[in-house]
Every structure is written in C-alpha cells, then in structure tokens.
Amino acid sequence: MNTLNETAAADESLDTAFLSSPQCAAPQRFQKIKRKSRASPETERKKPKSTIGKQGENPSATEPRYGGNSNRFGLLAHLTADKQVGNEIGDLYDQPSTSHQAAIAAAKRDAASAGTTSSAKRAQSKPPPIVMEGVDDVYLMMQSIENIVDLEKIEARASMSGVLRLYAADANTFRTIVNWLEIEEYEFHCYQLKEDRPYRVCVKGLHHSTLHHQIKDELEKIGHKVLDIHTPLRRNEPGTSKASPVNMFFLNIAAAANNKEILAVKALCHMRVVIEPLRKRNAIVQCHRCQQIGHTAKYCRKAHICVKCAGEHPAKDCTRPRIELCTCYNCGGQHPANYKGCSKLQAFLQRSRPRSGVAGRTEVSDRPTPRGLAGGKEIPSSRGGISYADVARGSIHHKQPMSLTHQQQKQKQQPYDGSPSRQRSRSRTRASRGTLQRSTDASSSIEAILQTLNENINSLRSIQEKQMELMMMMMKQQQQQSHQQGQIINLLTALQARQAP
C-alpha cells in the first residue's frame, strides 16, 4: 500500500516537471515522458489482496481501506486526473513551437514569392524577332552591339535567303537593340511586344460628331487610359463625292487588369452605347513603307518603296502618270504592289494556311468494302418484319423482300464465277483503283484546261498592252498634227498680213 502511494506521488511529480519544462512541445521528449506516464496506471491497477474475512488477521480499525482512502472509488479519481494530464500534454503537442511557426511562415513566404516570380515570368512573353536584310558583316555588328548589351542575351539566326534574325532574351534587351539599330540607321523591321499591345474595343451607338477628348476624359474618370481613338469611314457610295463617317469608334486602351470592365459601360457622353472587343482581322498585313508582306509600317525602318512604280521614294512623291501601267515591287507584274491578286501575296496566303492533311493523297485499302456500305450507307434488311411466329408457321417464304440497293441489284445480276470471296474482293479493289485512276486523269485534264485559260489570259493582257501602246502613239500623232496645224495657221496669218495693203 505504501508502494502504491509512492508511485502515485512520483507520477504527479513527473507530470508537474514535464508541464513546467520549456521543451514540453518537443516530439521526442514528449514520447519518452508519455511512455513513462502511461506506465503508472498499470501499476495502480494491481490492487493489493483483500484481507477481509480472513481468520488470524487483525487489521487496525483506524487504518482506512482501499488504498489509504475511505472512499472505495479513490483510485478511479486518480486515474481520471492522470487522463486529464495526458490530454493537456496532447494539446500541447498539437500546438507547434515558436520556432516551428516561424519556419512555416518563412516557407509560406518563399512559396508566395516563388509563385509571384513564376506568374511574372508567365506575364512577360518572349520578345519577337528583329529581321534584317543585306547585312554584310555580322561579326562587326555583334562587336558593336556588345558595347550596349550582353551577347549572352542575344541569339542570331541566318536563313538561306539572306535574312538575319536577332532574338533577344527579354524586353529590355529588345528595346535597347532596336534603339541602337535606329541610331546606326540599319534597315530592319520588327514587331510589337506582346506586353505593349493595347486592349482594343469598338464603341457602337455614339454619334460620329462626338469629340475625342470627351470620350477620353469620361473613360479616364472610371480608370481606363485611352491611347488612341479612330473613327471609321464608310466606303464611297454611288452618288457621293467622299466617304462619310460611321457612328462608331475604335479605341486603344492601355493594357491593365481592369480592361474587361469597360465592356460593362452602357452610357457614354450622355448616350447609350454598346462596347465590344474589336474583332481580329484575318487578312495578311502589308507594309505601306517597303511594300513587303508580313509586317506593318509602324515597326519598319527600311527604305521607302513606291506602291505604283516600285521606285525608292514614297508614293506621294511618285511622278508616274495615271495612264501608264503600274509595276509591282514584289512580283514585277503590271499592277500596284498592294493588289490582292498578286502572286507573291497568294503564295504567302497559301503558306500561312494551316495544313489539315496532305492534298491530293487518296488512300486505297486492300480490305474489301462490305456490300451496301459504299458511301457510308447502311445495309437495308432484305428480310425485315419477320417475327418468330412467322418462322414457326412457315410463312416466311410468302414475305416479299424489301427493295435492294443499286449495288446489290448489280451484284445479283452478275453470275457467280466460282471464284473465292478473297478473289472477288480483290477484283472490287482493282475496280476502285481504276476509278481512282480515272479521277486522276480527270484532275490532270482540269489542270490542262486551267493552264490554257491562264495562257489565254496572258495573251489578252499582252493584247491590252499593245492597244495601250497604240493609243499612246495615236495621242502623240494627234499632238504632232495639232502642232503642225498651229504652225500652218501662223504661216497663213503671216502671209495674209504681208499681202494686205
């Protein structure tokens, strides 16, 4: 009994020492102490043997029973207290220490900073290439560029056609190279950075007489910075001398996180409006400066090329008369450089179209086509409407078969030659190949017809050119005749003046 009391007192002292220690939340120390504290109830459960009712023993009347306590449930109270202490220790174990909380906070900050960095990298797109033509010495140019930027941030690539492309690693390097090339007066063209592209919208329902600064001021009040405003013009209609403006505005707004909020604007300048994102044009762009295809004049630093005569001057300075034929800079044909039917433009369009498959390729399978499936049609049932009762009665022979397809009728009319099914399928495959050969011959004949048409068109063009030359010659002859007539009239006038008294 004394041993039991000493054990309980030792357990209480251990619990008190554990709770007062600063490392109570450490996992390893807690596990060791927890095993020690859990060992005490097992010792307490070993109750001493009862001496009640035994002869020869005279227990003291003043000594309490049941472990030194008059209450028979005293030991259970100690066990309950021990469980409460264990729960408190478990709660302390669940709560991390101060150093552990600091480590978790630091890890969260690192993860947040890593996420921000990755999102910033995603937002910053790869710069477009800088395209140059006619570079004589790339090594000297790279040596000059090395003075302003690190060459590790530049990648150059030369094509077989003599075009040099410079690829910058980031936007700052791209802008630095472009500014340096402009200062050194190199001929090149580039493209707009993706991060500099504005958000373009179309404002419908606003009268064309609305002043641009009014639209700009109202949109800036609600947090949208307007970069440019354009009013489209309607094409010349019959009976009108000039194009008329449309009640519509195209707006370029600076890129921001709230760009799409402008679509919710329903009133502008005291008028009801509808704002929509501007639709993308699928047309191929052409530079109005150098007349080349694939870029715009805003980012072109090449020499000016005339759209009419292909000379090295702007179109506004061209002196070629309207009566003369134009010369295309791209293909050399007798049409303006911006003609939509230009062969160079059509070839560019053909290259830019996505390829869905190899044109002109027809697959021929050795596996025979099942009867009735040619052209994707289902096989009609020739014994449709037959029930089990009809078969049982034997009236199936009185049923009239449904109409056969044209192919089945043709096969039915052909006599069976005794050849196996594989041989018959091969014969059908040969027939399909013959059909393919006939279709190939038809396509070749169509190509020949188209070629003859092109030749006829070229001959007509040459005839028109000759007619134009004849007209020019006739005009010159008329001018000479009028000049001669004027000289004759002057001579007659002079003679009459001399003959007069």
Swiss-Prot record:
Indicate yes or no for the key word Nucleus.
no
Annotated spans, Disordered:
20-71, 105-128, 353-385, 400-443
Q: Where is the composition biased (Polar residues)?
A: 434-443
Q: Which domain of life is it from?
A: Eukaryota
Extract the SMART domains matched here: PRE_C2HC
Q: Name one GO molecular function term.
A: nucleic acid binding
Q: What is its main location?
A: virion
Q: Which Pfam families match?
A: PRE_C2HC
Function as written in the Swiss-Prot or TrEMBL entry: Strongly basic protein that binds directly to retroviral RNA and may be involved in its packaging and in the reverse transcription process.
Q: What is this protein called?
A: Nucleic-acid-binding protein from transposon X-element
What species is this protein from?
A: Drosophila melanogaster
